[in-house]
């Protein structure tokens, strides 16, 4: 059986009410992105960065998975190991929708990482304050998020899975961070979902949905069915 990859970005979680640093309102407007999302910013003012991620966890607690998260979870349940679910998002909305084995390329907001033993543990939506590593009891901790100027270890998993992928589906990402057009070119067939037209990106894909993911996801699910039957989308 052929393999499918769904790679998602901020456009997947935006309908749930989660803002990104590309939005001009909400949580991000109060911060300079490079001060709170870069390795340099963390070295200069770790408290400011950790407070920022506390605020993001609090925001995450107040939103819910949307129809697209739930549909992807259903697709993963149906296709199992033949569907790779990869996301640039750091939220837990796919998991809360019931999706298994999600690969988070840029880290996971509910988790902290121990700088002493490198252990990773989940704190849910709680604040960073007074936490200690359950493994080594160290309080030398940080958010488990890949910041600007840092390497993303999960990219190795992404590229390994891409070489096993026949149908590549890009959802809600502009290609500004990852070269999704290049990824599409590596696979037999490809589907793009974006909210606004982008001719430079669209030229790499076989099928394009320029619309909200909520309205596109059921069509994409049908495309997957067709691809698994006869190799077309």
Swiss-Prot record:
Q: Which reaction does it catalyse?
A: N(6)-acetyl-L-lysyl-[protein] + NAD(+) + H2O = 2''-O-acetyl-ADP-D-ribose + nicotinamide + L-lysyl-[protein]; N(6)-succinyl-L-lysyl-[protein] + NAD(+) + H2O = 2''-O-succinyl-ADP-D-ribose + nicotinamide + L-lysyl-[protein]
Q: What is its main location?
A: cytoplasm
Molecular-function GO terms, alphabetical: histone deacetylase activity, NAD-dependent; metal ion binding; NAD+ binding; protein-malonyllysine demalonylase activity; protein-succinyllysine desuccinylase activity
Q: Where in the cell is it found?
A: Cytoplasm
**How is the cofactor bound, in the record's words?**
Binds 1 zinc ion per subunit.
Which residues are annotated as active site? 106 (proton acceptor)
Q: What is its EC number?
A: 2.3.1.286
Binding-site residues, substrate? 53, 56
Q: Which residues form the Deacetylase sirtuin-type domain?
A: 1-230
Residues noted as binding Zn(2+) in the record, renumbered to the chain: 114, 117, 133, 136
* GO CC terms of this entry: cytoplasm
Where does this protein hold NAD(+)?
9-28, 88-91, 172-174, 200-202
* UniProt entry keywords in alphabetical sequence: Cytoplasm, Metal-binding, NAD, Transferase, Zinc
Needs which cofactor?
Answer: Zn(2+)
Its function? Answer: NAD-dependent lysine deacetylase and desuccinylase that specifically removes acetyl and succinyl groups on target proteins. Modulates the activities of several proteins which are inactive in their acylated form.
Task: State the family it belongs to.
Answer: Belongs to the sirtuin family. Class III subfamily.
Please give the record's comment on domains: 2 residues (Tyr-53 and Arg-56) present in a large hydrophobic pocket are probably involved in substrate specificity. They are important for desuccinylation activity, but dispensable for deacetylation activity.
Return the protein name: NAD-dependent protein deacylase
Query: Which organism's genome codes for this protein?
Result: Campylobacter jejuni subsp. jejuni serotype O:2 (strain ATCC 700819 / NCTC 11168)
Recite the lineage of the species.
Bacteria, Pseudomonadati, Campylobacterota, Epsilonproteobacteria, Campylobacterales
| Gene behind the chain | cobB
């Amino acid at each position: 059986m052929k393999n499918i990859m769904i790679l998602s970005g901020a456009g997947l979680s935006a309908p749930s009410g989660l803002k990104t640093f590309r939005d001009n309102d909400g949580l991000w407007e109060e911060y300079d992105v490079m001060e709170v999302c870069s390795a340099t910013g963390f070295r200069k003012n770790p408290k400011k960065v950790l407070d920022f991620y506390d605020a993001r966890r609090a925001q995450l607690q107040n939103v819910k998975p949307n129809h697209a998260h739930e549909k992807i979870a259903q697709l993963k349940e149906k296709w199992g190991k033949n569907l790779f679910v990869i996301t640039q998002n750091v939220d837990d909305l796919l998991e809360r929708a019931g999706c298994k084995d999600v690969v988070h390329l840029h880290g996971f907001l509910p988790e902290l990482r121990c700088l002493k033993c490198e252990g990773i543990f989940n704190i849910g939506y709680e604040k960073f304050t007074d936490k200690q590593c359950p493994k080594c009891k160290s309080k030398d901790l940080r958010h488990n998020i890949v910041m600007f100027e840092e390497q993303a270890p999960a990219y190795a998993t992404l590229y390994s899975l891409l070489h096993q992928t026949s149908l590549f589906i890009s959802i809600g990402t502009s290609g500004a961070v990852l070269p999704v057009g290049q990824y599409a070119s590596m696979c037999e067939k490809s589907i793009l979902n974006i909210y606004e037209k982008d001719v430079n990106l669209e030229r790499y894909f076989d099928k394009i949905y320029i619309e909200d993911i909520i309205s596109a996801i059921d069509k994409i699910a049908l495309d997957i069915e067709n691809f698994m039957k006869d190799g077309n989308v």
